[in-house]
């Protein structure tokens, strides 16, 4: 398997920034092993970009390129004092111009992460959940029936 270290990621980020945005990337890009639910993130305070190492391991360099493009959209817009958030028109426009995706592929499917399954005692609907639910407070969203935890 091909490996990519932080220096290769830095070089790739600088190259993508010049190629797609026609502006230099003057900060740091590095892998963060602690990222779990996101492909990468742009840090507003330091202007650095962190990338989820597991994305490279599972999906390869093309996924990393897409993540870098997305984070560079945040980076360049923030430095230009334009709308850098997902909801902003500037961000959506720049993502479209550069071919940066709005989201990346999930590393694990939701079904694989499910730890609890609840069933409505009234309509028998099943609800897979990652986190435990307080069955005294939560009710079925379809019929307002009482939920019961099933043993996996």
UniProtKB/Swiss-Prot annotation:
Q: In the record, what terms sit under GO molecular function?
A: zinc ion binding
Identify the main location: cytoplasm
Source domain of life is Bacteria
Give the binding site residues for Zn(2+): 70, 74
Q: Which cofactor does it need?
A: Zn(2+)
Which family is it part of? Belongs to the SprT family.
Q: What is this protein called?
A: Protein SprT-like
Q: Which organism is it from?
A: Staphylococcus saprophyticus subsp. saprophyticus (strain ATCC 15305 / DSM 20229 / NCIMB 8711 / NCTC 7292 / S-41)
């Amino acid at each position: 398997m091909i490996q990519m270290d932080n220096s290769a990621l830095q070089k790739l980020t600088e190259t993508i920034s010049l190629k797609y945005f026609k502006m230099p990337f003057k900060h740091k890009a590095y892998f963060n092993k602690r990222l779990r639910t996101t492909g990468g993130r742009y840090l507003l305070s330091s202007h650095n970009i962190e990338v989820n190492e597991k994305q490279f391991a599972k999906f390869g360099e093309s996924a990393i390129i897409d993540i870098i493009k997305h984070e560079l959209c945040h980076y360049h817009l923030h430095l230009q004092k334009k709308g850098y958030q997902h909801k902003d028109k500037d961000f959506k426009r720049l993502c479209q111009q550069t071919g940066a995706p709005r989201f990346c592929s999930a590393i694990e499917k939701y079904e694989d992460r499910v730890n609890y399954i609840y069933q409505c005692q009234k309509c028998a609907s099943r609800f897979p959940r990652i986190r435990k639910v307080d069955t005294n407070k939560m009710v079925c969203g379809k019929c307002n029936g009482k939920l019961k935890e099933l043993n996996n």
